[in-house]
Structures are given as structure tokens and as C-alpha cells.
Amino acid sequence: MKYIIPIIILSFVLLSCAKKEDDSSSTTSTELEGTWVTSCNTASWSNTEYVIQTITVTGSALVWKWDEHSDSSCSNDYAIWTDTYSSLSLGSEVTLDNGSKGIKFTTIVDSIVGLMQTEAAATALNNYVFCGDSDWALNTTKDYSGKTCDNVAYPAKNATVSGVYKLDGSSLLINTGSITSVGSTVFTKQ
């Protein structure tokens, strides 16, 4: 009997330590809370178009926006592409392709939409039948989640998307669709 009480106490101590260790392996979304913006960069899909990306995290909601422009100073509006996600959940640390560390995350797709800000943009997408659609219209939001557009398969609404990010002070590198690379586009906290 005298050995049972110390064993019970030791069990509680070990469980308490294990619980604390488990808690440290995940991260809360508060470290991503706020607005993160890139500089004006050449668009990944065209070397004649330019984008400013903005990521806004509020609680477990994440909005990723690409403001597309027709000039290298990003002053002439062309289109806005917006991915809206919910249930953002930050996971454990992972090792990236370059050997550095990042944090894995998952989130759920609410919508993936485009908004043409010029007639030229709407006409170009209609002529190209982008996403299989020829009814893109000026200043009208169009959801293309779940579609394949220009050989890119976009996730459907309610799909779970995985990604990874790396945070260094006020600089953020982030990527969806991969948990081994964060890319090279730098977001700066506003």
C-alpha cells in the first residue's frame, strides 16, 4: 500500500509534464492575426501583369487577396482575386525543403472568386473562356472554386486545404498546396 500512493503521484506528475509538452507542439492563430501585404510583384501567371497580395487573419478566418494591375507600379487596377477560408488551424513544426523550420496549417475553403475591374479584363477572360466560363462581367464577383482554370485545379467549397508558413518577426512566407516549401514572396505585417 505504501508504494501505491507514490506511484499514483508519479503518474500525475508524468501526465502533467506530457500534457505541457503536447501543448507546445501546436501554435495558436494569434501569431498570424492581422494584415500582411507584399510589395508590387510580377504575377506568377503572367510576366505582363503585376500583383499586390494581402492576407488578413481574423480569429480562424483567413482572406488571401491578389490585387492585379496592368502596370509595374501597381497603380492601374485590372482584377481582384480573393480566396476566403475558415476554420484556420495551426499545427506542428515541419522541416522545409531548404532545411529550415515552418508551421503546418489547415483551413477550409469558403469561396474562391474573381472580380474584373476593367472591361478589358472581362473581355480577355471571356475570349479565353477562363475556367470554362464566358460570362465574366465588369465589377461582378464570380466564384470559380472547384473548377480547373488554365490547367490549375482549384479546391472546391468546403474542401480542406493544407499549407505551411514561416514567420520571422514582421515578415511572413506562406504557401498553400505544399507543406515543404513556403516560396519566396515576402509578406510584411501592417
What residue spans do the PLM features occupy?
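Generic N-terminal initiation segments characterized by hydrophobic and/or small/turn-forming residues
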Residues: 1, 7-12, 29, 42, ...
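Bacterial Sec-dependent N-terminal signal peptides
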Residues: 3-7, 12-36, 190
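A generic structural signal for short, solvent-exposed coil/turn residues
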Residues: 9, 28, 54-56, 80, ...
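Acidic/polar, low-complexity intrinsically disordered N-terminal segments immediately downstream
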Residues: 20-63
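Contiguous, well-ordered beta-strand patches that form the walls/edges
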Residues: 39-48, 63-169, 179-190
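C-terminal amphipathic alpha-helix
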Residues: 172-173
